[in-house]
A protein has these predicted regions:
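Generic structural signal of hydrophobic/aromatic residues within well-ordered alpha-helices
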Residues: 38, 42-43, 97, 101, ...
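Well-ordered beta-sheet/strand-loop patches within structured domains
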Residues: 28, 57-63, 70, 81, ...
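Generic N-terminal leader/processing signal
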Residues: 1, 5, 25-27, 83-85, ...
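N-terminal, intrinsically disordered, polar/charged segments of Gram-positive cell-envelope systems
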Residues: 28-97
Length: 434
């Protein structure tokens, strides 16, 4: 009896399937098409002909999207509206959107094709909740403690677009009146405190001694160092000593002191400024800066090794270099204890750089120049007749070369010749008491 009943039930089910298939449109031939039609029938049974409605909860607020009919301005638009069921009820739209997703289209594209006003709704919400990130900021105070003040960065926030369309799709597949909570994602800042911290490494430090200089020359060295102090260079930015320090004039604060003109020491405004430029030049070399312009004096200065001086003259000779470190560079130039000091801060150097001065050839030192102190400028009145005093040492002419040695993990990996120079001889000066 049970077997007979089972056979009757199976036969009836088979007949029902055949009859259902016979009444389907002719174009539905595949299993996928059959599934799509089943979705459409299910949607019609559940949703009827309601319009889609979406309520979004975010930041303690709610806003609602209600599907609206769109008027067609021309035949082409009318065709698009019809094909995408833009003005249809929810049941047809939900089924069509699901078909698109099943065929590999993204949920956003599948929804927007039938709901063209949905993106502007999403953008409106996004603008209301979006908060831009705040980068970490760094202030350089060269003479302060600490030298660098770094603020913390803050993440921004924005609506998660992908999650929005995914949630809308899932909600509208369940019901024409959907409620979702808007998901958000963080926007990272472009610059973090850690990024700024990496740019505070002491890249190089160099100093020269000016303690035995005269009062006016000391003033000029110190003034020039003050004028270059606090310089900041972005990656790729160039520095000009003359542009930064300005004209060597009384109006610009400079005094008269010894300068080199035509191979002789004479009085002139700004004497000593070349010691400031030389100090800065050497620190720039050690910091890995790309030196664009630097030249030697006619006479070898006593405060630095040959081929490592940087003579400057406003309007003609300059010290120029470019920051090519991959980050910002901060320059601190100052004077302390009779020394001119230049420090470069920025990202850590790839190499430890060492200077090397080589004297290629050297001539004979010229005979000293003798001055009789007829006016009593150098000796006290009670000084013994015939007393001698040296007021300037002499030096021979020389040819020199400057090299930079690059060390990595304690090993010299390359050597680079940067310049070759010729220096004139310097006559020593002796003063005699008549």
């Amino acid at each position: 009896m049970k077997n007979a009943f089972g056979k009757i039930f199976a036969t009836a089910a088979a007949i029902a399937i055949v009859l259902f298939a016979a009444f389907l449109p002719a174009e539905i031939k595949t299993a996928r098409a059959f599934s799509d039609k089943a979705d459409e029938i299910a949607s019609e049974r559940i949703f009827g002909d309601q319009k889609s409605c979406l309520t979004v909860c975010y930041s303690g607020r709610t806003t609602t999207y209600t599907d609206e009919e769109i008027a067609a301005p021309d035949h082409e638009a009318e065709y698009e509206i019809h094909e995408n069921k833009i003005n249809s009820g929810h049941r047809e739209k939900a089924a069509l959107v699901k078909q698109r997703v099943n065929r590999g289209l993204s949920k956003k594209c599948a929804l927007v094709a039938s709901y063209p006003l949905l993106p502007s709704f999403f953008e409106k919400i996004s603008r209301e909740i979006e908060r831009l990130p705040k980068d970490s900021e760094m202030t350089f105070s060269p003479g302060g403690q600490p030298k660098f003040i770094i603020t913390r960065e803050k993440n921004g926030i924005k609506a998660d677009e992908r999650a929005f369309y995914s949630d809308v799709f899932a909600a509208w597949q369940r019901s024409p009146t959907a409620v979702i909570t808007l998901k958000t994602e963080q926007i990272p800042p472009a610059v973090t405190a850690a990024d700024n911290k990496k740019q505070t490494f002491l890249k190089a430090r160099f100093c020269t001694d000016y303690s035995r200089s005269g009062k006016n020359r000391k003033h000029n060295v110190e003034l020039a160092m003050q004028k270059t102090d606090g310089t900041e260079l972005s990656d790729g930015e160039s520095f000009s000593f003359n542009k930064t320090v300005g004209r060597r004039s009384g109006e610009n604060g400079f005094y008269e002191a010894k300068i080199i003109v035509g191979g002789e020491y004479v009085d002139g405004l700004g004497g000593g400024v070349c010691q400031a430029s030389t100090t800065l030049y050497n620190a720039a070399l050690l910091a890995g800066m790309n030196v664009d312009e630097a030249g030697s004096h006619t006479l070898a200065p006593s405060y630095v090794a040959p081929s490592f001086d940087a003579a400057v003259s406003y309007g003609s000779r300059d010290l120029k270099f470019t920051n090519c470190s991959g980050g910002r560079v901060f320059i601190h130039t100052y004077c302390s204890g009779g020394k001119a000091i230049a420090e470069f801060y920025g990202v850590e150097n790839k190499y430890h750089i060492v200077r090397k001065s080589v004297v290629v050839s050297q001539g004979e030192a010229p005979e000293d120049k003798l001055i009789i102190d007829e006016e009593g400028k150098y000796f006290a009145p009670d000084a013994e007749e015939g007393s001698m005093m040296r007021i300037r040492g002499g030096s021979a002419s020389l040819v020199s070369e400057g090299y930079l040695l690059y060390y990595e993990s304690g090993k010299c990996v390359k050597t680079r010749k940067i310049r070759s120079d010729k220096y004139m001889p310097v006559r020593g000066i002796l003063v005699k008491k008549p």
